[in-house]
Amino acid sequence: MARLILFGPPGAGKGTQAKHLVDLLDIPHISTGDIFRAAVRNQTPLGQQVQAYLDSGRLVPDELTINLIQERLHQSDVQKGWILDGFPRTLAQAEALEKLLHQINQPYDRVLSLTVPEEVLTQRLVLRAEKESRKDDTPEVIQKRLGVYWKDTAPLLDFYRNQQRLATIDGNQPESDVTAQIQHIVDQLKGEKIV
């Protein structure tokens, strides 16, 4: 069983590594974006609230996001663990998530933080935008997204480091090497739980 929070700036390879973890551990990859889309598509009461925020171009409030995550973590496929991606993004969200996970007795095992130099991130995101024909990912938008990450989200690394639950992985190496490093960390977690 593993409960992991995947962390890193846009372009660090979180989605790629999440796919490897899903295959390795047979646990669900939970992204806030997917949760929002599913709730809206299913027109749940929470989904209708999300739709109202998205339609008006506003950010979905933390409390609503936490409620959706709580709903997702009560589904049967998370019994063996989960990979949470895209949340938390701020200290307030991290604290709310800590409280929720404590309440539902599903503490996370590790925060896996992928680190990549900013110039490499920019190159990756520009290439991805070209490859996927994403016109909204202009160099200016990419810089803004990275700026938001460094300002709002990166400070959470200290929060998790202080709890001694942070594992930092060099994401600026071949994909298979990153995967091997993550697998080693997961194997160590399994060993800790046996002892």
UniProtKB/Swiss-Prot annotation:
One of its GO terms (molecular function) is adenylate kinase activity. One of its GO terms (biological process) is AMP salvage. CDD domains: ADK (cd01428). ATP binds at residues 11-16, 128, 173. Residues 31-60 are annotated as: NMP. Residues 127-137 are annotated as: LID. Keywords: ATP-binding, Cytoplasm, Kinase, Nucleotide biosynthesis, Nucleotide-binding, Transferase. Its EC number is 2.7.4.3. It is an enzyme of class 2 (transferase). One of its GO terms (cellular component) is cytoplasm. Pathway: Purine metabolism; AMP biosynthesis via salvage pathway; AMP from ADP: step 1/1. InterPro entries: Adenyl_kin_sub, Adenylat/UMP-CMP_kin, Adenylat_kinase_CS, P-loop_NTPase. It catalyses: AMP + ATP = 2 ADP. SUPFAM superfamilies: P-loop containing nucleoside triphosphate hydrolases (SSF52540). It is found in: Cytoplasm. NCBIfam families: adk, PRK00279.1-3, PRK02496.1, PRK14527.1, PRK14528.1, PRK14531.1, PRK14532.1. Catalyzes the reversible transfer of the terminal phosphate group between ATP and AMP. Plays an important role in cellular energy homeostasis and in adenine nucleotide metabolism. Monomer. Belongs to the adenylate kinase family. This is Adenylate kinase. It comes from Cyanothece sp. (strain PCC 7425 / ATCC 29141). The gene is adk.
